[in-house]
């Protein structure tokens, strides 16, 4: 069955490119979530006054990739201990988060992060919330690194080759 989860971890260009290469991911789209302005522009989000985060909607076939596997992938490509910063990107729109619509997904996410937290003394700064809203970003942001192969990317894309059960 195809399911959706929304993930954030810095600039959405690299996150989208990374998840597009994961077996079982059927579709991704970048946008702005969790904010207090309807259909914000990129420029509005960059003012850090709308409370949106750059987010990637990941549609995946759970027969081929599990939610836990997707969470492992996200965890390996971001700094989970950083607040409002990933790579060179600084600001609340670059915070790390996992957003869900299904209650059973919430339990999986919370258990996953609890396990990770128990393995470290550092505080994990990934927010977990029910998806409040998701506004699709402008077309020029969609598949940005496919259109601009030399574009900025804070994500180590070669890590997508690693498999998680």
Curated annotation (Swiss-Prot):
Record's catalysed reaction(s): L-methionyl-[protein] + [thioredoxin]-disulfide + H2O = L-methionyl-(S)-S-oxide-[protein] + [thioredoxin]-dithiol; [thioredoxin]-disulfide + L-methionine + H2O = L-methionine (S)-S-oxide + [thioredoxin]-dithiol
InterPro entries according to UniProt: Met_Sox_Rdtase_MsrA_dom (IPR002569), Met_Sox_Rdtase_MsrA_sf (IPR036509), MsrA_MetSO_reductase (IPR050162)
UniProt KW Oxidoreductase keyword: yes
Example GO BP: cellular response to oxidative stress
Catalytic residue list: 11
GO molecular function term, any single one: peptide-methionine (S)-S-oxide reductase activity
PANTHER family named among the record's database cross-references: MITOCHONDRIAL PEPTIDE METHIONINE SULFOXIDE REDUCTASE (PTHR42799:SF2)
Family: Belongs to the MsrA Met sulfoxide reductase family.
Name used for this protein in its record: Peptide methionine sulfoxide reductase MsrA
Organism: Ureaplasma urealyticum serovar 10 (strain ATCC 33699 / Western)
Taxonomic lineage from the root: Bacteria, Bacillati, Mycoplasmatota, Mycoplasmoidales, Mycoplasmoidaceae
Gene: msrA
